[in-house]
Amino acid sequence: MNLTKQPPRRPSNLSIAGIVGLARMTDKARAFNNETLGEYLYGGDSGLDRKILDFLSIPDEQFAEAVEEYDDHTLDTWVIAQSTRTISEIEEFNQRELSIEPQTEEYRQRLKDRLAKYAPDRTDIKTVLQSVELDDWGNFWQLDLTKQPPRSPYNRNIAGVFGIARMAEKAR
C-alpha cells in the first residue's frame, strides 16, 4: 500500500472485524511497514488508530507485524481472537465513532475549510470521520492517468472486490 499515491480505505469501512477505522488502519500499517505512509499517521500518532488499538488492547507494533503476516480475511479472524470485545461493545464503539462531531474550534474550522474547498454545497457532512473522508477524496480525486496508470486490476481495497478501484480511477 502506497499512501503517497492513494488514500487508505475510508474510516467508515467495516470490512475488517466489523470495526470502524480498522480497514483504514490496516492500510496505514501496511504503508508504515513499506515506508510509503506519506503524510498519514499510524498507530499512536493517529487519534483514530490510537482509539482502535486501545479499544482492542493491541499494541501498534503487534498490529503492524500482523498486517505483514495476514491478508484482510485472516486479519479479521486474528483481531477478533486477540480482542476480548463483544459484538455489542463493537457496535457501541462504532456508533460512537461514526457520530462524533468536531469538539474543538480547531477541528470545527478544519471541517469548515474542507467543506469550503471540496464540497461547498454539502450540508450533510458534520462528523469527524465524514471530514476525514472528504479530505481523502479532495486530495486524491484528480489522479492524472496521463502521468501514471490506474491502480492494478488485482487491487481489492474497495469492498474487497478486484478491479473496482481501477474502474473508479478510469471513470474520473
Segment roles from a protein language model:
Residues M1-Q62, A66-E91, Q95-R96, R108, ...:
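Polar, glycosylation-prone regions of secreted, cell-surface, and some intracellular proteins
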